[in-house]
Curated annotation (Swiss-Prot):
<dbReference type="GO" id="GO:1990748">
    <property type="term" value="P:cellular detoxification"/>
</dbReference>
<dbReference type="GO" id="GO:0035226">
    <property type="term" value="F:glutamate-cysteine ligase catalytic subunit binding"/>
</dbReference>
<dbReference type="GO" id="GO:1990609">
    <property type="term" value="F:glutamate-cysteine ligase regulator activity"/>
</dbReference>
<dbReference type="InterPro" id="IPR032963">
    <property type="entry name" value="Gclm"/>
</dbReference>
<dbReference type="GO" id="GO:0017109">
    <property type="term" value="C:glutamate-cysteine ligase complex"/>
</dbReference>
<protein>
    <recommendedName>
        <fullName>Putative glutamate--cysteine ligase regulatory subunit</fullName>
    </recommendedName>
</protein>
<comment type="subunit">
    <text>Heterodimer of a catalytic heavy chain and a regulatory light chain.</text>
</comment>
<dbReference type="GO" id="GO:0006750">
    <property type="term" value="P:glutathione biosynthetic process"/>
</dbReference>
<dbReference type="GO" id="GO:0006534">
    <property type="term" value="P:cysteine metabolic process"/>
</dbReference>
<comment type="similarity">
    <text>Belongs to the aldo/keto reductase family. Glutamate--cysteine ligase light chain subfamily.</text>
</comment>
<dbReference type="GO" id="GO:0005829">
    <property type="term" value="C:cytosol"/>
</dbReference>
<keyword id="KW-0317">Glutathione biosynthesis</keyword>
<dbReference type="InterPro" id="IPR036812">
    <property type="entry name" value="NADP_OxRdtase_dom_sf"/>
</dbReference>
<keyword id="KW-0963">Cytoplasm</keyword>
<comment type="pathway">
    <text>Sulfur metabolism; glutathione biosynthesis; glutathione from L-cysteine and L-glutamate: step 1/2.</text>
</comment>
């Protein structure tokens, strides 16, 4: 066996609306990953061995809940509103080629698990960016204090990644695009360089009660929708994912890191009731 060989592991939480106990939903404005962490801690995972699974051919292990095997959506996909938030957690080594592979993995796994081929809205979260700069960010997850601190190559990575998303829009796989934690400066840099502009930005303003006027005016001029959210920039830490993997796969002793996370929310279109909500996480470890 090759020493220090990198391996990938995909974890599927199942429907968190069924698995989570009441009272742990984060309805406040305080950033928290409690929903995801509890979902991973509370679920018993087993290896998925679906027929024709391309992950198996790539030697990627997939773990799914023991008592909730993936099922295709009931009825036609047009009956559902499917919202996906994609968290890129590759801040230490941003690689556009790998992000392209991530997008392929995301759509492949959505199809494999649920038969989903079209996402109504995809919101992307980039590393190192937070709207509220003084919100007490962890030193383990570098956050830039201003747009001037962001290296030009990282800003270019937003644009290059966005162009990959634009291709998915052109292919009919995504309806609309949104961003997370982008303020006016970040939005200006992005919008000036892309063809498909974001239709929304998700921000966290902490305990503040009022949105900045410059953002309100910018959103009005560019027809942007503004949404509040409570997701931390680093959605899942190395220690958190390592603990989950050790529990599910004791044979994997080494630390793991998270490559990307998606949260999917599937709404019944005519009633706006949540049909399913869950997370898919890809991590990397070495053998």
């Amino acid at each position: 066996m090759i020493q220090n060989e990198k391996k990938h592991l995909i974890l599927y939480t199942g429907d968190v609306t069924k698995n989570l106990k009441s009272g742990i939903w984060n309805a406040s404005r305080i950033k928290s990953n409690l929903e995801l962490v509890k979902a991973l801690e509370n679920v018993k995972l087993t290896k998925f061995t679906g027929d024709g699974d391309e992950n198996l051919k790539k030697n990627i292990k997939v773990l799914v809940p023991v008592n909730e095997k993936p099922q295709k959506l009931d009825g036609k996909q047009e009956e559902y509103e499917i919202i996906v938030k994609l968290f890129f957690l590759d801040g230490e080594n941003i690689d556009i080629k790998k992000r392209e592979e991530t997008l392929s993995q995301v759509f492949y796994n959505l199809h494999m698990l649920f038969g989903i081929d079209f996402v109504s809205t995809l919101v992307v979260s980039f590393p190192h960016i937070t709207f509220l700069k003084e919100s007490g960010n962890s030193s383990s997850n570098e956050i830039y204090d201003s747009i001037d601190e962001i290296p030009p190559q990282e800003i270019q990575s937003w644009v290059d990644t966005w162009k990959l998303l634009e291709e998915k829009v052109g292919e009919g796989k995504i309806g609309t695009l949104g961003v997370s934690e982008f303020g006016v400066n970040e939005l200006q840099r992005l919008i000036s360089s892309v063809n498909v502009v974001p239709e929304s930005t998700q921000i966290n303003i902490g305990q503040n009660c009022k949105l900045p006027n410059d953002l309100l005016n910018f959103a009005d001029r560019h027809h942007l929708k503004l949404f509040f959210h409570s997701d931390p920039s680093a959605l899942l830490s190395e220690s958190e994912i390592t603990s989950v993997i050790h529990k599910a796969c004791p044979e994997i002793p080494n630390p793991a890191r998270v490559d990307w996370v998606i949260r999917y929310t599937i709404l019944t279109r005519h009633t706006a009731v949540i049909h399913q909500k869950g997370y898919i996480v890809q991590s990397t470890y070495t053998e």
